[in-house]
Amino acid sequence: MPLDWGFGLPYNQEMKIDIVSDTVCPWCFIGKRKLEAALAARPDLEVEIAWHPFQLHPDMPAGGADRKEFTAQKFGSAERAKELYDNIKVAGQAVDIPFNFEKIKRSPNTLDSHRLIRWAYSAGCQDALVEILFRRFFIDGEDIGDHAVLIAAAEEAGMDKTLVAELLEKGADRELVSEEDTRARQMGVSGVPFFILNDKYAVSGAQDPAAFLAAFDKIAETEAAEDAPE
């Protein structure tokens, strides 16, 4: 299972990329697109990607909160919230994400969505599930704190919906996910998205593809120097 920071995973690829994110973070969705653009520019680069939890609002009630009330309180006013989200919409359009913030009615607690992402790693469909959750929340306006929505997302990603329903119901891995979130903060992660490449290099925020490409080049340069005969 992904969660050791060093991460103890069987990475046999040329590069591993660990992504710390939250499922209600629009910049994480944008950052995913920018990373994908960088990877598309390097088609020969084999990567293994693992997603890790960071709850932006860990104290959110289990049932979530009314979206308008929550964002108005968070940003000081409904007008300020709209202004900020309009700016994010523009950033999303640049990477072909049609954010539909007006459609979102609930701001969910994201713990259960992170539990599901954890299980998706073992199922071999983690990246696909993250994409599905982003789409369902930011574009379709679904409540990704709702177990029915999470089960549907899991099924769409190819997971066993019966098993997922059982795991969600019995509270499996709640503490493990919370512990990993805490570990990320202890390592210095204070905002998301946060990308760790080969356990050595960090890219913080939804940076442009050029930032990832520069990191790829630095890693290749460093590894070539390490492998060079003395």
What are these regions (language model features)?
Residues 33-140, 226-230:
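Structural alpha/beta surface segment adjacent to cysteine/selenocysteine redox centers
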Residues 22:
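Acidic active-site catalytic centers that drive phospho-/nucleotidyl reactions
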Residues 25-28:
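Short cysteine clusters
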Residues 11, 17-19, 30-47, 51, ...:
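C-terminal cap of thioredoxin/glutaredoxin-like
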